[in-house]
């Protein structure tokens, strides 16, 4: 299905929903926080089930949702694009916050089940990329990411990139910007590592960051190595790249990179790195609930090759504490992370 066909389908679905919502005075939409509403397909990631549990929009919230659908309809008709921030400025009288707009846009994507860019809505990209990568952006400018000091901003519309070139051997995804910048300062590109592309989503990755990682991995068959903190939320970020996210499973857009591996910081290596309990924070109640919930996910239960991940999650539980990559940096202020830890792990394929 090409782009124009998707736009036409989106228009038809918007018109149908607008009529139904105005007639019924309410709208049922999939509950995007319920893991029972998605199923795991190996090689693709998360997909919605046929009969999901639903929530309801009515009253003022429904009115705001209809406004957003009308904005999307106009964007498709005029073949224009806007950001969620711009939508908030258009609706600031009726919407109390950016978060409310973001939620209603997510509801629209879930109900329509089409990629957000088809609807003409982009999010401001926060991710960075640096390394062996060149491309031409939507304005015809050639961007050489090897020249970026501190990293180039990932474009909002990754689908518009052309003439993409790289001779990298792999993609290194770093959870936090502080670690990303420290690796640059410590000469990760001047050491003994093979040619690479380094990406950070600055925490939870946005859509553009995930699109870029998926695009580069699929187009150039590049392995994706992911470096996160050793805590439940670092592991969640790894799962997001590898299997997809709960919220975006409704968008009919492949974003998961099933070949991704967890490079570190692994629970099983904390003792080897001599990170003592006194320097690690204990798990919070929220951390504990997160680990319990993750352990029940379908992709951890179904995939035989996930024995290693299940074991690491058990070790994380047993340790009862969490460690940040920044602690390694502070313990060894001699470029250890860039010049020793990463080269050693990558050369020995020491990942999960």
Q: Model-predicted segments: where are they?
A:
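Nucleic-acid enzyme cleavage-core boundary/entry regions
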Residues: 1-225, 232-352
């Amino acid at each position: 299905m090409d782009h124009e066909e998707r736009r036409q389908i989106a228009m038809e679905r918007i018109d149908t929903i607008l009529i139904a919502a105005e007639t019924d005075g309410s709208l049922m939409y999939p509950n995007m926080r319920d893991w029972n509403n998605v199923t795991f397909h190996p090689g693709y990631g998360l997909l919605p089930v046929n009969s999901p549990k639903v929530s309801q929009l009515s009253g003022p919230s429904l009115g705001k949702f209809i406004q957003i659908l009308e904005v999307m309809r106009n964007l498709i008709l005029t073949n224009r694009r806007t950001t969620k921030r711009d939508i908030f400025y258009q609706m600031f009288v009726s919407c109390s916050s950016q978060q409310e707009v973001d939620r209603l846009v997510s509801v629209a994507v879930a109900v329509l089940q089409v990629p957000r860019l088809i609807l003409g809505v982009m999010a401001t990209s926060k991710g960075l990329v640096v390394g062996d990568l060149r491309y031409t952006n939507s304005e015809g400018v050639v961007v050489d990411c090897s020249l970026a000091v501190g990293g180039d901003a990932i474009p909002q519309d990754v689908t518009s990139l052309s003439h993409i070139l790289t001779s990298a051997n792999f993609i290194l995804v770093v959870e936090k910007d502080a670690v990303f910048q420290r690796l640059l300062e410590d000469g990760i590109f001047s050491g003994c590592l093979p040619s690479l592309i380094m990406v950070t989503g600055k925490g939870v990755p946005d859509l553009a960051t995930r699109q870029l990682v998926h695009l580069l991995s699929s187009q150039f068959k590049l392995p994706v190595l992911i470096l996160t903190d050793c805590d439940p939320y670092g592991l969640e970020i790894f799962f997001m790249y590898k299997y997809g996210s709960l919220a975006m499973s409704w968008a009919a857009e492949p974003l998961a990179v099933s070949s991704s591996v967890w490079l570190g910081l692994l629970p099983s290596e904390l003792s080897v790195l001599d990170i003592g309990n006194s320097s690690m924070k204990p798990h919070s109640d929220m951390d504990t609930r997160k680990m319990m919930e993750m352990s029940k996910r379908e992709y951890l239960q179904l995939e035989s090759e996930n024995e290693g991940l299940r074991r690491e999650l058990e070790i994380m539980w047993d340790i009862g504490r969490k460690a940040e990559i920044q602690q390694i940096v502070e313990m060894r202020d001699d470029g250890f992370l860039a010049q020793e830890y990463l080269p050693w792990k990558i050369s020995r394929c020491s990942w999960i």
